Each structure stands twice: as C-alpha cells, then as structure tokens.
C-alpha cells in the first residue's frame, strides 16, 4: 500500500467485507464485532460489508483499466458514453449506501470540557462536499484526539477512531485522502479544495503502524 492502486484497495475491501460478514453471522462473535465498530446501526454494518458495493468498485476498476489501456484522443460521443457508464455505477453505489449514514457521522473534534465523567466535545461534522462543515456537540465517555478523525454513532458514547488514511486540514476546511508514499513524503489528494488539491507531507509513525495493521 506504499503505492496504493484502485485494485489493491478493492481487494482489501472485498477481503475485509467477507471476514466481517463471517463474524456477524457467528452468534458468538457478532456482538464482539459490532463493538469493534462502535455499535453502529444494522444498516451501517450492512452497507460497509455489502457485496453490492464491492461489485460496483470492481466494475469501475474494469472500466478505468479498459479506458486507460486504450488511451489517446476520444470523441465527444465516447466521452459522453463514459460519463453515462460512471453515472450508472454511481447510482448503484448510492442505492447500496441509502440511509446507512443517518445515525453515523465522521467528525473532527475541536474543543472539549469534562464533567461528571463525561467529555463534551465541539466537533466538525465531516459530511458532504460543501464547506465550511457544520459544528456539532457530542458526548463521549472517552477522550478524543483533535489530530484524529472518528466515526460517531448517535446512539453511542464511544466514537470509533479511524485509521490515518483520511486527513482533515482545518486551515482549508478540506478533507484529504491518502494515495501513496513517494520517497519520504506522503501524497494526499482532496476533492474539496481545488487551490491545493494535492499535498505532500512527511510520513509519520501512525501511518506506518496502520500499514503494519493491514498486513
């Protein structure tokens, strides 16, 4: 994953989804598995382990490789046809996601207070393509690191820390995604901030620990 490819991520997604489904179908392991994900809704677990989503991702990878292999100048008709093909896959993806995120959100904690054993955090709610992101207040039984991102379920009080493949840059109010390591720097890309759509930053220990975790 030092030079991540679409195919590698798809294979990882497929393998993890299959493993999680096995845990969820095992009555002795189901609750343990749900707890690892912060006890989200059944709709959320169903979505992230969906065979349908994996199939869509593999289909898009096939299209991408096909178009890349036959590179060169393409006609407007061909370009329009490609857009229609991708829109079809996007609609399929939306169908599988549906309302799975209604009770689960990704957040970036900011300020905090502590009283009677409960942390009260202000946090950026990282939803959608429009910025600036909304600020919300959440209750938590555990401390949250403002340098990290979390998944928070509205019915739970222990947000789930995400692996550091997604980064929120507060100064630009933009989300960046890990793409590769080049020399000693990490390359990040954003779909929010066109003025600086790519970043290169020194790799840190947390990222390498995440790589070890995925082996």
Where are these regions (language model features)?
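Accessible peptide chain termini
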Residues: 1-2, 215
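Flexible secondary-structure boundary motifs
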Residues: 2-63, 92, 185, 196
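Polyanionic, low-complexity intrinsically disordered segments
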Residues: 46-215
């Amino acid at each position: 994953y030092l030079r991540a490819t679409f195919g590698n991520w798809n294979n990882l997604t497929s393998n993890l989804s299959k493993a999680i489904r096995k845990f969820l179908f095992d009555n002795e392991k189901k609750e343990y598995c749900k707890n690892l994900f912060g006890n989200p809704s059944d709709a959320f677990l169903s979505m992230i382990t969906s065979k349908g989503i994996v199939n869509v991702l593999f289909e898009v990878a096939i299209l991408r490789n096909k178009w890349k292999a036959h590179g060169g100048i393409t006609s407007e008709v061909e370009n329009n046809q490609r857009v229609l093909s991708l829109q079809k896959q996007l609609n399929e993806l939306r169908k599988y996601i549906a309302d799975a995120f209604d009770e689960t959100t990704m957040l970036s904690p900011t300020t905090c207070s502590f009283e009677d054993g409960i942390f009260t955090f202000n946090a950026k709610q990282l939803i959608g393509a429009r910025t600036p992101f909304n600020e919300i207040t959440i209750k938590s039984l555990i401390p949250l690191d403002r340098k990290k991102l979390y998944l928070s379920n509205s019915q739970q009080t222990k947000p789930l820390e995400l692996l550091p493949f997604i980064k929120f840059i507060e100064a630009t109010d933009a989300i960046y995604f890990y793409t590769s390591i080049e020399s000693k720097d990490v390359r990040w890309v954003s779909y929010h901030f066109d003025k600086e759509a790519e970043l290169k930053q020194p790799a840190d220990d947390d990222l390498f620990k995440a790589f070890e975790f995925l082996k």
